[in-house]
Amino acid sequence: MNFDELSSARMNEQLITHPKYNGVYRLCEPIEGKQPDGAWVMGMVYQDVDTLIKYWRPITMFGKFSIWEGGE
């Protein structure tokens, strides 16, 4: 599935910035078994990036070329 298809399929997803990686991430599905309750409701996500990156894996990063996968 390419980026345009993902964008069309997830019109409600938000973009977040992450200062550590100097980029903007488009979020996809929560990491299996990692997301806290209420993390993904009608396309809304945590605004606290420190909390967010523990539970979510971005699929696209704008800025530096990098892929980050979260979960500890």
Residue ranges of model-derived segments:
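Short solvent-exposed strand/turn elements
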Residues: 35-55
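Residues immediately flanking
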Residues: 30, 48, 59
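Mixed-charge, Lys/Arg-rich low-complexity intrinsically disordered regions
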Residues: 1-12
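Residues that flank catalytic or metal-binding motifs in active/ligand-binding sites
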Residues: 12, 23, 42
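Short beta-strand-centered aromatic/proline hotspots
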Residues: 23-32
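A short beta-strand micro-motif
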Residues: 14-19
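Intrinsically disordered, low-complexity, charged/polar segments
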Residues: 52-72
